[in-house]
Structure formats: structure tokens, C-alpha cells
Curated annotation (Swiss-Prot):
Expressed in roots, seedlings, leaves, stems, flowers, and, at low levels, in siliques. It comes from Arabidopsis thaliana. Residues 651-791, 811-913 are annotated as: Disordered. One of its GO terms (cellular component) is trans-Golgi network membrane. The protein kinase domain is predicted to be catalytically inactive. Residues 39-343 form the Protein kinase domain. This is SCY1-like protein 2 A. HEAT repeats lie at residues 311-346, 347-382, 383-401, 402-439, 465-502, 499-537, 578-617. Residues 682-703, 716-726, 756-791, 811-820, 830-868, 889-907 have a biased composition (Polar residues). Keywords: Golgi apparatus, Membrane, Repeat.
Amino acid sequence: MSINMRTLTQALAKTAAVIEKTVQTTVQEVTGPKPLQDYELLDQIGSGGPGLAWKLYSAKARDSTRPQQYPTVCVWVLDKRALSEARARAGLSKAAEDAFLDLIRADSGKLVRLRHPGVVHVVQALDENKNAMAMVTEPLFASVANALGNVENVDNVPKDLKSMEMSLLEVKHGLLQIAETLNFLHNNAHLIHRAVSPENVFITSAGSWKLAGFGFAISQAQDGNLDNLQSFHYSEYDVEDSILPLQPSLNYTAPELVRSKTSSAGVSSDIFSFGCLTYHLVARKPLFDCHNNVKMYMNTLNYLTNETFSSIPSDLVSDLQRMLSMNESYRPTALDFTGSSFFRSDTRLRALRFLDHMLERDNMQKSEFLKALSDMWKDFDSRVLRYKVLPPLCAELRNLVMQPVILPMVLTIAESQDKNDFELTTLPALVPVLSTATGDTLLLLIKRAELIINKTNAEHLVSHVLPLLLRAYNDNDVRIQEEVLKRSTSVAKQLDGQVVRQAILPRVHGLALKTTVAAVRVNALLCLAELVQTLDKLAVTEILQTIQRCTAVDRSAPTLMCTLAIANAILKQYGVEFTSEHVLPLIIPLLTAQQLNVQQFAKYILFVKDILRKIEEKRGVTVNDSGVPEVKPGCVADGLQFQTPTKKTEKVASAAKNSPAWDEDWALPTKISAPRDPGPANSPQFNNSTVQSQSSNRTSVPTTCPAVDLEWPPRQSFNATAQPANDETRINAAGTPTTPSFDELDPFANWPPRPNSASTASGGFHNSTTTQPPINNSGSGLRNNLTDGRQFQTTNNDFWAFGNASLSSMKSQQETSGIRASNADPLTSFGIQNQNQGMPSFGSSSYGNQKPQADISSIFSSSRTEQSAMKLAPPPSIAVGRGRGRGRSGTSISKPNGSKQQQTEQPSLLDLL
């Protein structure tokens, strides 16, 4: 049996077609119509069409590789299942549903064929399956019905739509565009729309008003053919048929279409509907609100009075009354309406009209218009600026001749936009300008760079703004270099640190070093000062190298002050140590620059002094005018912290008060300055116990760090000159009394005239500092007095056994230690002399001007030698043992006590000698 190949091929082709159709149907049932397959829905933006049955969604193409006419589009979706359920609830027949769907199909078919700027542009034609219908158009904002507050069939009302308020200027501009579209339909397309209403007028994302909803449209050739003319049937009672509207809304329908027996339906029917729409938009309320009740409609129409038009502008009333006339012949044409004084007398509207057709004008006309617009645009509201003014200006930026004129206005208007708005509408138009700008255009963009920086994200900043700045760095125009340096910091704050170091910082260094213009160098140095806070130490070191090279050839005052600004920024960012090590070596030589005036030099010297002061505070050491260092209590000096051990001194003070022979107010200095009569035999035992108690206290009281011996001269030099002191030191280590130099520690050693007792007590307190922590830099020997004061009682009897040889050795020791002490602290003896000068009561006592005073002092040592030795101030007025060093407040208390004690003890001293 032979096989007919032709028949087999045909059979296979039919089978393949059936399979393909089945597959397509199955895919559509699963994924929906083709527009839903090709585009990804984003958000619902509104609703529109007959009965607001269409849901409008913003969408973008799923295949981003294919070129698209619009970045975003509007997808119209009609849910058949929801429509069928609503029809069943309303009790309507299936035939009514099918008739409505046929109306939708006719609308989309005519919309595809019509090409006009005033008609909604279809991107992808209608496609449907058994569950839904969908088509794709240019991006839309919403329908006019939504803008007027009717948001039926909108699940979530967008924020922009909810807060939308159309100004009269925007309404005028939109009505003028619809009038031009009707003129095109009537005179060019020869169509009668018959359903001009807010549901069928749409606002695009660019702000233009466009016409749709051609389901009821007929050609003018069908006007006189009653057989082909579709008749509308409106009831004489209220009917809500908005679910499946099979005729236009009665509120916007001409009376000749409402009558049951109509002779004709011409273009004047659209003018009547357009008049109703105009009234609604201007008066903010509909002219007819009859709920499809024809009787109410006719009553309202027959009794239109002047009161009805009270809310209409006077220059529109006459034209609007003609448009709403029941007599068709009285109604103006669409073209006539565009010539109304309502439109012609508004200068702002004329400016918007010029912008609509700006691409058709020559450069001379554009220049003249833009000059007038520069003073006029401030009167526009934000919506008009965003949707009416900015889009045509951005489109005109492609004209290189007009860029310097248009760009300032575009950037000024962009200031009123939020960040999202700017990135969606303005930035795409600016990107070509940013990549090609030169000369004055580049200068303008650099001056307004902060606006672009603040309204773009980091990705756009790196891809579009940063290349613009780099071209400005390399430009030879000094003005551009200055401006880009001023804007560098704001860009650097939003960029990654590595990008700043690799792209911006080297170019700023280059401008600072290579330029011959002082203004450019100053701005470059100021830029470096502002960038310090974002840089690491390595980059800051490079900045210091640039400063050194700049100041080597340019020591003008502006350059030097910019250098100081960088130094201050480094000090603030990295502190004193880094600044003193790296910045001060550069700053100090600049102090000798003659270009600095008085105020500028003062700022320089204050900067240096401030650093030195902070270093002193950190070390805890201050140096007075005489060069004497002073260590503050509780501060760190040479890595050690000082803390006054108050517990030990308080115990010594309590022990002193237990002795009946000591003065209760100020015991220790009094006992040291004058020898007392030989005490009872138990005095040595009392002092030994006191010393032992002090030794135990020293080991028990904790300190913050090991003690530092601050006594001067050092012990080894003293021991080398006085062997008895060495012997005494060894005894002190065993817990017995010692006899150190008195001149080094006695606060009253240099008071003139010096009594004999001052020299006799010169062996008391030297080596006690071997285990005692210091107090401060001005009274290091005071605690030695307090600690070893009790030892004097056990040593004064043995002291006289040394004889004249011992006194001679002590005298030489006193001279040596005094000279060394005066070299270490020349202010010490000066302070004691001031205190002595302020104490006349002691000098005028029984030793004041008496001859025996000179004889007594000659026994021990010369008063001149004693005056030259290092002296310490008397202890403070507080309790004994506080260890607060030299203080003048203590002298007022010591004066009467010391004077009184020496007066009472002078006879016993003379008897002893």
C-alpha cells in the first residue's frame, strides 16, 4: 500500500496547528494574555474607560535586553471573572455582558488605528483569554475621573493621586489639548466620539491630556444613516448601570442623543459633551447629576440660569453657554473654542503652549521665549512645573546651542523635585549633558553640582557625576578649577574612601602644586583641610609633604593661613602627639614669615602655644617663666603618678599632739627651729616608738606607683661630704633617729636675723626620703620634717658632742647642699625671702636687733652662707602632715607660734652655750 506523502504532510500540518493552538490557549489560561507575559506589573495607578472597568497598572518589560520605546508603560487589565460576578449580582443578562465586551473590543481596535498626539498611544494591542483582557499603552498618570475624586475600581489609591490638586492653569492647558484633539477627530479623522467624559480622558505621566474610549464613536458618514446609527435608551427613573454601561453617561451626553427620535448626531454632540466636561473641571462639580434619569436631565437642561454659571470665570461664561445650548447650530466648533479669551488672555498658558511646540521653533524664537520664561516660571505651581514645563525643557537640552540658556532653568526647577522624581524625570535628560559638557556649560554644572549630588544615589554619583568632576579637574579654565575644588568635599563625603584617595585626592594635590594662580592653590589647600577628617594618617602625611613643597616657594599670607587651617584639622582629627611630631616641624619655621600680619601671626603663635599647653597638661608638668618645672598633684610625670599619702601624715600629726612639749597649733616647725631644754630621760624612748610607728605606716599604706625620691642634693653627694650623716643613715635603717642637714629642709632657716638654734638643728632630717614618696615639686622636704620631727629629741643631746669639728663639717655640708638646691629651684629661696619679708613680728622679737644675736650666729656659721642655701616655704595652715608643699597661707599661722617659742627658749639656749 503506497502512502500519499502530500496527504500525510497536510494531515501533519493540521495536527501541528491544533497542537500549537492548544498550547497557546493553555499558556494563556495559566499566565494570562500576552501583555501580562511580556510585562511585569508594578502598582495600580488608577482606573478608566466606560464605567471605569479598566484597571491601569504601571509596568516594565520583562526582557530588558530588547529596546523599549518607554522605560515604563501602562498595562490595561479587565478581569472577566470579576465582571461576570458583578453582572450576576446586579441581575443583568449574559447578553449584556457580551455586548459590553464587544464595546471594549471596538474601543481598543479604533484606538490602535488612530495616531495623534492627543490620542492615547497603544504599544501592544488588546489580547484576551477566557479570564481577562489586557493591552499596553504609553505611561499614564490616571484618568480625569480619578483626578476629580472618582477612584472606583482602584484597590489602593496612590499617594500622588490622593493628594492631587489641579490648578486652573493646568485645567486650561488640558482643555485646550482636548479641544485640539476633537478638532482632529472632526476635521481629519471624520469621527464623532459621542462619549467625551472624565472616564475617557487620561493624563499621561508627562502631564498631557489625551482622549480614549472610542467604543461609541461613529464616522461622520454614518451620521445620516439611521439604520446604522446606534440608538441610546435612557429610562425615566434612576438607574445605576455603571457596571455594564451600554450607552454613554447621561451626565455628559448631548440632548439630541437622548431623544428617542433623533434626526442626526453631528460633531456638535461632542461639543456639548465637551462643555459639560469643561463645567465640571472649572466649577469642581458636575452640571448634571441625574443618575441616568432622563426626566431629571431634561429639567436641569431646560432651567439653566445665570446662577448656574456663578462659579465660572467671566471670560468663559458666554462660550460655555453657547456650547451647552440645546440648539446644535449655536454651538461653536472645537477650533472656535480654542480662540476663546479664556485661553488667549492668559500669558502663562501661552508660555505652556509654546513649550508644547518648542521643538518646532527656531533658536532665535526659543531664546526670546526663554528670557521671558526666566521671570515667569516662578508663578507656576509644582505640578505645572513638573509635568508641563520640565519635560519640554529637558528634551531641548539636546540642542547644544540652547544648552547654556535652558540648563540653568532646568536645574532651578529641579530644586523643587524630590529625589525619586529627579531620578525618574530630570536625571535621564541630564545624563547626556553631564557626559559631554564643556566650557560655560561645564562651569554651570560644577556650580550646581551639589544639587545633583544631593538628589542622586551612590550608583549614579559614581557613574555620572564623578566623571564630570574629573573632567573639571583637568580643565585649563581657572574658574572651573576653583569651582570643582569648592565642591570636592561634598562629593567625597558620599563616596567610598578608596575612590576619594584614588580619583579625587591626587588631582587636588596636582592643582595645589602645579598651579600658578593663587586662588586655585588656596582652594586646593582648603579642600585638603576639609578632607583631613576622611583620610588616614598615610594620606595626611602626603598632605604635609604637599604643604612643605607649597610653602617652600609660596609664603604669601593666604597660603600660610590655609596651611594653618590644615594643621588645625590634623590636630582635631589625630591629636597632640601626631601633630607635635609631624606638623610642628612645618609650622614653626613659618612663624618667621614677614608676610603674616599681626592677627595672622597671633593665630599661628596661639596654635603652637595651644599644642605646648596640651603637652604640659598631658605630662602633668608646667614650667613657669623662670624655667622651673612644677609637677601637679595627681598628675603623671615621667611615667609615674603622684599621690599624697595622707594616712601616714595624719598618724604623725596625732603622735605629735600626744606630746605635751609640742605646740598644739603647729608643733613640728617650732621644735625644729629652736632647741628645747634637755628633756626627761624617757624622751628618746618616745621618739623611737614614733619612728617605728611611722615605718609600719609606710609599708601598710598603698600608693598608685613606686615612690620617687625628689630630694636635692642627692644623698650620695651629701654622704660624701659628711661622714656622720652616713653613720646616722645606717642607724636610721635600723629604726633609730637620724641627723640630716637642716638648711635643706627647715622652712625657717633663712629668716634674718638667724638665731643660734637654727644651726644647732641642722642635723635632723636628710635620709628620711629613702622610703617616703614625694609630695610635690615645691615642698618635697616637708613630709621629711613631719616624719622625722620626733627624732630631734633623741639627737639634740648627742649633737653637741660633735664639737667644733662637727659644726664645721655641717657648715660645709650646708653650703654645698644649698648651692645645689638653689641651682635646681632658684625660686625656693626667693619664696622664703618673700615670706620672711611679710613676717615682721618674728624679726622684731627678742632676737630682732640685739647684739647677742650676732655673737650666737658666729658660733655656728655665717648668715651670708645660710641665706644662699636652698630654702623651703613653711607648711600650710592645715593640720600637720598634709604634705601640700610651699604655701603662703601657712605663714600667717607660723609667725606667732615660731616667735613665741623662740622667745621662751632663748635663756636655756644661752645657758647651754
